[in-house]
Amino acid sequence: MDKMTKEQRHRCMSAIKSKNTKPELLVRKFLFSRGFRYRLNHPRLPGHPDIVLRKYRTVIFVNGCFWHGHENCKSYVLPKNNTGFWKNKIERNRNRDMEEHQKLSSMGWHSITVWECQLKPKVRQHTLEALEHTLYHIYLEDRKRISYKTIEEESSMVAESLTEDTKN
């Protein structure tokens, strides 16, 4: 049984934001402080990613554990009321997220998901540093140059030729 009336529950649920959430702001503030520049909620990309780093061809989704059904997380507990509705809703969200990641991948974009529980104070710094490391890794991997080894017939050093010239 819900402790709130329908009207109270409606007001409570309506107040939940989808943009500029605290976890999203934490990630954005960290990225900006480390020199990463980004766009928000890009309308032309599938799923309107929370953060888009064009230079890295990477998008970041900052997901709430409850709303996106984070497996094995304390924050993801199905409500006791109307469980069928919530189970279907969260399952649809998961499927939609998976489809969006696949579409982005087929378009050549990397997608990273940061979960709300990964931004709790005890693990926040580790998560953000791992995110930074991942972005640098993506950048370097995407820009790898193929190096061709050439076989030199005679390897000589400049210093050798100078010393030989001075002897004569």
What positions do the PLM features span?
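Nucleic-acid endo/exonuclease domains
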Residues: M1-T113, C117-N168
